[in-house]
Amino acid sequence: MAVKKQFANFAEMLAGSPKPVLVDFYATWCGPCQMMAPILEQVGSHLRQQIQVVKIDTDKYPAIATQYQIQSLPTLVLFKQGQPVHRMEGVQQAAQLIQQLQVFV
C-alpha cells in the first residue's frame, strides 16, 4: 500500500528507509499508470513487511524523473539502501512483480 508522505530530500528518504523502497514513477494522465494502481496496492499488501511503496508523480517532480532517467510510464524502480537495484517499465502483473521483487528483499 502506498503511503502519502512529504519529504524534503528524495535521496535521504530512500537512504533512510529500513526496507527496500519500490518507487512507482507515474503521471495522472497515464492510462497504463492507472492500471498499475490496484496492482501496486495488491503487491504492497502482499509484501508490506518487506518493502515500502512510494509513488512519484513525474509532472510534479520532473527533476527526480530526470535524475533517474525515467523515459516511459509507468516505471518501477526498487531502491535498496538508497541505490537503484531493479527497474521495470510498463504494466506488470501482480504475481510476476512479486516474484521479481522477492529476489531483492
UniProtKB/Swiss-Prot annotation:
Pfam families associated with the record: Thioredoxin (PF00085)
GO biological process: cell redox homeostasis
InterPro entries assigned: Thioredoxin (IPR005746), Thioredoxin-like_sf (IPR036249), Thioredoxin_CS (IPR017937), Thioredoxin_domain (IPR013766)
Domain spans labelled Thioredoxin: 1-102
GO annotation, cellular component aspect: cytoplasm; cytosol
Keywords: Disulfide bond, Electron transport, Redox-active center, Transport
Keyword Transport: yes
GO molecular function terms attached to this record: protein-disulfide reductase activity
Annotated S-S bridges: C30-C33
PROSITE patterns cross-referenced by the UniProt entry: THIOREDOXIN_1, THIOREDOXIN_2
Family: Belongs to the thioredoxin family.
NCBIfam families: thioredoxin (TIGR01068)
UniProt protein name: Thioredoxin-like protein slr0233
